[in-house]
C-alpha cells in the first residue's frame, strides 16, 4: 500500500554553518577549534566548503523550485561574538538578517540552530562545555540572538549534544581529540543540557514569539541476541551513553534511577566522577515541559554484544567498508547481524530503528509535544554523470525512512516534518568532501550546483505528500 504524509508536513533540507558557509575568517568571524584541528590532523579544511556564505541565494532559489519548504541553518557563534563573548560583530549579525530574509522571500522556513559543533576557539580551548563558564556565555549568546533575530520562528539550542561529547572525548575525532574518557562525555552532555534548559527558560520567560527545542542524534540500540541478558544489558548501557541520559535531561528534568545506575556502573569500570549540582537540576526541571519540539537526527542503528575487554574504537573516515571497530569496557561491543546493509562508512541502514526511536520517545516521554526528523540521509561516493547523479540508493533510503515516519504518525506519534541531510553537498567533519549527502550536487572546484535524481523525486513527494 502506498503511504502518505500530512498536508502540512515540512519537507526540508538541512545545513550547518561550518559545513556549508566557508568564509571561515571573513567579515570579522572569529576562529573555531576546527580551523586548526583540521589543518593539523586531516587532509582537508572547511574552506570554502559549499560557499553558502555567498551562494545562499542560489541554494534557496533551488529549494523553492524543488519543493523544499524548510531549511535547517545554524548561526556561527563566532560570527556574532568572535571570541564567544564581549563585543558583537555587526557584519555577522547583518549576514544572518540577510540570509533569513532570503529564506522568507523564497517561502523556505528557517529552523535556526545556535550551536552546531562550532564553539569559538577562545572558549573551546578553555575547556568548552566542561567549563561551567561556557554555560553563561552560551546563554548570553542565545539571548542576543533571540532579541536580534525576531524574524526567526523556530529555534534550536544545540545540534547533537550526544555526538559532541562522543566525538570530543570518546572517539576522539573532534577537537580536542581526547579518547575513551567517559566521565568527560557525560559531563559535557550534562553541562550542555543545562545550557539548553537555561536558554529555553529565558526564551519563554521573555515572551519571545516562535518555538524552541533541541536536536538530538538518537541511534537505536538493539541487543545482538535478544535472548541473552548480557547482550540486553550491553544495549541498555550503550543507549544510556548515546540517548537516555540526554533524553532524561530534556523531558524528565533529572536522570532516572535506572539511568544513573548505568552511568555509575560505566564510571566505576572506566574511572572518573561527575559534578552534578542542585542548581543544574533546578534548571533542567524548570525547562522539561517547555520544549516546543524535539528534533531527531537518525541515520543508523547498532546491535550490541556483551564484551569483556579493553576499550578500542576505530573510526572509518575514508569509506573503507569494514574498517571500523567499537568496543567499550564494561559496556559492550557493536556487532551487526550479517543481513543488515551498511554504507561504505559502516553506517547501518535500518529504517525500522527510526520508527522504534520515535515510538520510544512517545512512550517514555509523554510530555514531548511534537517531533521533527531534523536529519536523515545517505552518505555516498556520488558519481557525477551528464550533469547529475543517478542516486537511486539515496532515493530508496529516504523513501523507506519516510514510510516508517508515515507509520509512526498512523500509530499516534506527532511528527511534523523531515529535513534531508543535506540540502546541497557539504563538507563532512571527519570525512572531508568525498562523502556526499546533498539533493544538489556541488562541484567544489566551481561551486556550481546540479540537482540529483533524488531532488526530482523529493520534489514530487513534497508536492503530493505521497511516498512512491
UniProtKB/Swiss-Prot annotation:
It catalyses: a 6-phospho-beta-D-galactoside + H2O = D-galactose 6-phosphate + an alcohol. The active site is at 160 (proton donor), 375 (nucleophile). Keywords: Glycosidase, Hydrolase. Pathway: Carbohydrate metabolism; lactose degradation; D-galactose 6-phosphate and beta-D-glucose from lactose 6-phosphate: step 1/1. PROSITE patterns: GLYCOSYL_HYDROL_F1_1 (PS00572), GLYCOSYL_HYDROL_F1_2 (PS00653). D-galactose 6-phosphate binds at residues 19, 116, 159-160, 297, 428-429, 435, 437. One of its GO terms (cellular component) is cytosol. It comes from the Bacteria. GO terms for biological process: lactose catabolic process via tagatose-6-phosphate. One of its GO terms (molecular function) is 6-phospho-beta-galactosidase activity. Its EC number is 3.2.1.85. InterPro entries: 6P-beta-galactosidase, Glyco_hydro_1, Glyco_hydro_1_AS, Glyco_hydro_1_N_CS, Glycoside_hydrolase_SF. Belongs to the glycosyl hydrolase 1 family. This is 6-phospho-beta-galactosidase.
Amino acid at each position: 500500500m502506498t503511504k502518505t504524509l500530512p498536508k502540512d508536513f515540512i519537507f526540508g533540507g538541512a545545513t550547518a554553518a561550518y559545513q556549508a558557509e566557508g568564509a571561515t575568517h571573513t567579515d570579522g568571524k572569529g576562529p573555531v577549534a576546527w580551523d586548526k584541528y583540521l589543518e593539523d590532523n586531516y587532509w582537508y579544511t572547511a574552506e570554502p566548503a559549499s560557499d553558502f556564505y555567498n551562494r545562499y541565494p542560489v541554494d534557496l532559489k533551488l529549494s523553492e523550485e524543488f519543493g523544499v519548504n524548510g531549511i535547517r541553518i545554524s548561526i556561527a557563534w563566532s560570527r556574532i561574538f568572535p571570541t564567544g563573548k564581549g563585543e558583537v560583530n555587526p557584519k555577522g549579525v547583518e549576514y544572518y538578517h540577510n540570509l533569513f530574509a532570503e529564506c522568507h522571500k523564497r517561502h523556505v522556513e528557517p529552523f535556526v540552530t545556535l550551536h552546531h559543533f562550532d564553539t569559538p576557539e577562545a572558549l573551546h580551548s578553555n575547556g568548552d562545555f566542561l567549563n561551567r563558564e561556557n554555560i553563561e556565555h552560551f546563554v548570553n549568546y542565545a539571548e542576543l540572538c533571540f532579541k536580534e533575530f525576531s524574524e526567526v520562528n523556530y529555534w534550536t539550542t544545540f545540534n547533537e549534544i550526544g555526538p559532541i561529547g562522543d566525538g570530543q572525548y570518546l572517539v576522539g575525532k573532534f577537537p580536542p581529540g581526547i579518547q575513551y574518557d567517559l566521565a568527560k562525555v557525560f559531563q559535557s552532555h550534562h553541562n550542555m543540557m543545562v545550557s539548553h534548559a537555561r536558554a529555553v527558560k529565558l526564551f519563554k520567560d521573555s515572551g519571545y514569539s516562535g518555538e524552541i527545542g533541541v536536536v538530538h542524534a538518537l541511534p537505536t540500540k538493539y541487543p545482538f541476541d535478544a535472548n541473552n541478558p548480557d547482550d540486553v544489558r550491553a544495549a541498555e548501557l550503550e543507549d544510556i551513553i548515546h540517548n537516555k541520559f540526554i533524553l532524561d535531561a530534556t523531558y524528565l528534568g533529572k536522570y532516572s534511577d535506572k539511568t544513573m545506575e548505568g552511568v555509575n556502573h560505566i564510571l566505576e569500570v572506566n574511572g572518573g566522577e561527575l559534578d552534578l549540582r542542585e542548581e543544574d537540576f533546578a534548571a533542567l526541571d524548570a525547562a522539561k515541559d517547555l520544549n516546543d519540539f524535539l528534533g531527531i537526527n537518525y541515520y543508523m542503528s547498532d546491535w550490541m554484544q556483551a564484551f569483556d575487554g579493553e576499550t578500542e574504537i576505530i573510526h572509518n573516515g575514508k569509506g573503507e567498508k569494514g574498517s571500523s571497530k567499537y568496543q567499550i569496557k564494561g559496556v559492550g561491543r557493536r556487532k551487526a547481524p550479517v543481513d543488515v546493509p551498511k554504507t561504505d562508512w559502516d553506517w547501518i541502514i535500518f529504517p525500522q530503528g527510526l520508527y522504534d526511536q520515535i515510538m520510544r520517545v512517545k512512550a517514555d516521554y509523554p510530555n514531548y509535544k511534537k517531533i521533527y526528523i531534523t536529519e536523515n540521509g545517505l552518505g555516498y561516493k556520488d558519481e557525477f554523470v551528464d550533469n547529475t547523479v543517478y542516486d537511486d540508493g539515496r532515493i530508496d533510503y529516504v523513501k523507506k525512512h519516510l514510510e516508517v515516519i508515515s507509520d509512526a504518525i498512523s500509530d499516534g506519534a506527532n511528527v511534523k516534518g523531515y529535513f534531508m541531510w543535506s540540502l546541497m553537498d557539504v563538507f563532512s567533519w571527519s570525512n572531508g568532501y568525498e562523502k556526499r549527502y546533498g539533493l544538489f550536487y556541488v562541484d567544489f572546484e566551481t561551486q556550481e550546483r546540479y540537482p540529483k535524481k533524488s531532488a526530482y523525486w523529493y520534489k514530487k513527494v513534497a508536492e503530493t505528500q505521497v511516498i512512491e
